[in-house]
Swiss-Prot record:
GO terms for cellular component: glutamyl-tRNA(Gln) amidotransferase complex. InterPro entries: Amidase, Amidase_CS, Amidase_dom, AS_sf, GatA. Heterotrimer of A, B and C subunits. The active site is at K66, S141, S165. This is Glutamyl-tRNA(Gln) amidotransferase subunit A. It catalyses: L-glutamyl-tRNA(Gln) + L-glutamine + ATP + H2O = L-glutaminyl-tRNA(Gln) + L-glutamate + ADP + phosphate + H(+). It comes from Thermotoga maritima (strain ATCC 43589 / DSM 3109 / JCM 10099 / NBRC 100826 / MSB8). The lineage of its organism: Bacteria, Thermotogati, Thermotogota, Thermotogae, Thermotogales. The keyword ATP-binding applies. Allows the formation of correctly charged Gln-tRNA(Gln) through the transamidation of misacylated Glu-tRNA(Gln) in organisms which lack glutaminyl-tRNA synthetase. The reaction takes place in the presence of glutamine and ATP through an activated gamma-phospho-Glu-tRNA(Gln). Keywords: ATP-binding, Ligase, Nucleotide-binding, Protein biosynthesis. Signal peptide: none annotated. Its EC number is 6.3.5.7. Pfam families: Amidase (PF01425).
């Protein structure tokens, strides 16, 4: 085994390796997974062996794919019993682009079932553990992807973000997580949760690596009508700093319970940006306080429609019963976990004729208000800044109450409701656990979001050799 520390190996560093070293990267990744994953449990499926083709600029670099993104030749389970043995007949567009660029998919990462959760405890198979503390959650729903990168099992990963599911686990695991502007990345091959909110995004060790992956996976796709034919440059201005920029901090975030250490790191990040020549001001965004409530009407409604296809007829689990109705009911009751069933029921209720106007339609109006207010602020400021998560990683099994659990995404949900680009960049610790700072930008100003995040990363007093230090998992 070549002497390379995967915890410190970035995409850019991989490009500097010799041809012989790059040939061995996928096997080294598999060996690291074999050694560490019994403790971290980041993967649902892992390839037994991989072949390396020297095609594409990024050939040989090992990555993980969240297990709700379709991959040819590997299971796509969505961490659900109902799709436990499902194999797709095609690659998702993002996977196809990654493979064409030369990346090697070594495994499929664990998640909360159908991406419904914020801790990766709600996988039908097993909870994933945070590499910083194996008794704690990695966040979710892309917890497996974040943990795999944080533990140094892969160089990078893809996740999906519906209400913070890339950014929140990135924050809790001390890595970078990016949600693009809605429409920049194809959702073709992503098993839908809430179609108007879902976006695929990268999880990496550095901001530059995330921008590199966005250059690869973004672009118009004829298979996804919501993608836009618009070229965004993610890298050309990434090193230009923040001098002269203006940032907005919503006053409403201070109305919520924020862990003391998280609040301290956030204020420290704001002072850093001011020292770098930026101006930071507090602003009012009145309707942002309704983001979580709005999300938990709209997302379950869309999920109840999207998940109706999993009925035991065409693919996935099928429980034999006497009649069709009984088969439907038994299959869905056995195949879906508690949280998925809860959200399907909520969504079905809010879409019903008697309650559609009172709940779903009203939530859509509030969503528009939130979006308008965010866009108004962003017309006057370069970005909105918040903590990524109000807390650091909590202990597995600690949170039982669904409402407390839902509030984990209180700072990340607004960007999904408005379709805005947002990134979580690691910045220091609270009680020896990573803290993330979130940057939210204007639609299609993804390049500027990366530029701001890079300035934070580049000047952070907590980073070593240009990146946040990652933990050593005791195997």
């Amino acid at each position: 085994m070549i002497d390379l520390d995967f915890r410190k190996l970035t995409i850019e560093e991989c490009l500097k390796l010799s041809e012989e070293e790059r040939e061995k990267l996928p096997q080294l990744s598999l060996e690291t997974i074999k050694r560490l994953d019994p403790h971290v449990k980041a993967f649902i499926s892992v390839r037994e062996n991989v072949s390396v083709e020297k095609k594409g600029k990024f050939w040989g670099i090992p990555v993980a794919i969240k297990d709700n993104i379709l991959t040819l030749g590997m299971r796509t389970t969505c961490a659900s019993r109902i799709l436990e043995n499902y194999e797709s007949v095609f690659d998702a567009t993002v996977v196809k682009k990654m493979k064409e660029a030369g990346f090697v998919v070594v495994g499929k990462a664990n998640l909360d079932e159908f991406a419904m959760g914020s801790s990766t405890e709600r996988s039908a198979f097993f909870p994933t553990r945070n590499p910083w503390d194996l008794e704690r959650v990695p966040g979710g729903s892309s917890g497996g992807s974040a943990a795999a990168v944080s533990a140094g099992m892969v160089v990078a990963a893809l996740g999906s973000d519906t209400g913070g599911s890339v950014r929140q686990p990135a924050s809790l695991c001390g890595v970078v997580g990016y949600k693009p502007t809605y429409g920049l990345v194809s959702r073709y091959g992503l098993v839908a949760f809430a179609s108007s909110l879902d976006q695929i995004g990268p999880i990496t060790k550095t901001v530059r690596d995330a921008a590199i992956l966005m250059e690869i996976i973004s672009g118009r796709d004829e298979n996804d009508a919501t993608t836009v034919n618009r070229k965004v440059d993610f890298l050309s201005e990434i090193e230009e700093g923040v001098s002269g920029m203006k940032f907005a901090v919503p006053e409403e975030i201070y109305e919520h319970d924020i862990e003391e250490g998280v609040s301290e790191r956030f204020e420290e990040a704001l002072k850093l940006l001011e020292r770098l020549g930026a101006k930071v001001e507090r602003v009012k965004i009145p309707h942002i306080k309704y983001s979580v409530a709005t999300y938990y009407v709209i997302a379950p409604a869309e999920a109840s429609s999207n998940l109706a296809r999993f009925d035991g007829v065409k693919y996935g689990l099928r429980i034999k019963e006497k009649g069709l109705r009984e088969m439907y009911m038994k299959t869905r009751n056995v195949g879906f976990g508690e949280e998925v069933r809860r959200r399907i029921m909520i969504g079905t209720f809010t879409l019903s004729a008697a309650y559609y106007e009172a709940y779903f339609n009203k939530a859509m109006k509030v969503r528009r208000k939130i979006s308008d207010e965010l866009n108004e602020v962003l017309s006057q400021y370069d970005a909105i800044l918040t903590p990524t998560s109000p807390v650091t990683a909590f202990k597995i099994g600690e949170i039982k109450d669904p409402l407390t659990y839902y509030l984990m995404d209180i700072f990340t949900i607004p960007a999904n409701l408005a379709g805005l680009p947002a990134i979580s960049v690691p910045f220091g610790f609270s009680n020896n656990l990573p803290v993330g700072v979130q940057v939210i930008g204007r639609r299609f100003a993804d390049g500027k979001v990366f530029r701001i995040a890079r300035a934070i990363e580049k000047n952070s007093p907590y980073n070593e050799n240009g990146m946040f230090p990652l933990p050593e998992v005791k195997a």
